[in-house]
């Protein structure tokens, strides 16, 4: 999906669910990591996370677009556009837009595991973060630690 297709999709969703046109720019922002999309208050543009489209498809993207359009139309009309505002929550329910998007699964962060073993008592420590073996010792016997397995 390219920039023109996403612009067309946002305009169609705006007319279909809100009955009002979307008169600004919609685009993908590949730098977004943890959020599905964002509405920019100063320019009234909408930025969407391309990775959500890759992972979950068009249906999830339409939900994110509806959520951001709720911010857009409420802000344009001068009503409460923030997540905590009653107007925003009511409009979300009316257009069946999700309040939160699905959780982004980051495979590379979950896989990395370090296994350390004490050289004296052979106690094993499983860690997600790497530790400095010159600085840290075994908590049981104060023996030296050795990295035995690193999975990534």
Curated annotation (Swiss-Prot):
Zn(2+) binds at residues 67, 71. Its cofactor is Zn(2+). The active site is at 68. SMART domains: SprT. GO terms for molecular function: zinc ion binding. Its main location: cytoplasm. One of its GO terms (cellular component) is cytoplasm. It is found in: Cytoplasm. Keywords: Cytoplasm, Metal-binding, Zinc. Binds 1 zinc ion. Residues 7-148 form the SprT-like domain. GO terms for biological process: response to stress. Transmembrane segments: none annotated. InterPro entries: SprT-like_domain (IPR006640), SprT_Zn_ribbon (IPR035240), Uncharacterised_SprT-like (IPR023524). Belongs to the SprT family. This is Protein SprT-like. It comes from Bacillus cereus (strain 03BB102). The lineage of its organism: Bacteria, Bacillati, Bacillota, Bacilli, Bacillales.
């Amino acid at each position: 999906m390219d920039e023109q297709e996403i612009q067309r999709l946002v305009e169609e969703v705006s007319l279909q669910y809100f009955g009002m046109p979307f008169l600004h720019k919609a685009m993908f922002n590949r730098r977004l990591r943890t959020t599905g999309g964002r509405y920019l208050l100063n320019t009234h543009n909408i930025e969407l996370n391309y990775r959500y489209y890759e992972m979950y498809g068009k249906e999830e993207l339409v939900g994110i677009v509806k959520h951001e359009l709720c911010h857009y139309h409420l802000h344009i009309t001068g009503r409460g556009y923030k997540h905590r505002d009653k107007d925003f929550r009511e409009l979300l329910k009316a257009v069946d837009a999700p309040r939160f998007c699905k959780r982004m699964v980051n495979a590379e962060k979950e896989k990395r595991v370090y296994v350390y073993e004490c050289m004296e008592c052979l106690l094993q420590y499983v860690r997600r973060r790497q530790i400095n073996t010159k600085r840290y010792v075994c908590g049981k016997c104060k023996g030296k630690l050795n990295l035995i397995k690193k999975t990534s």
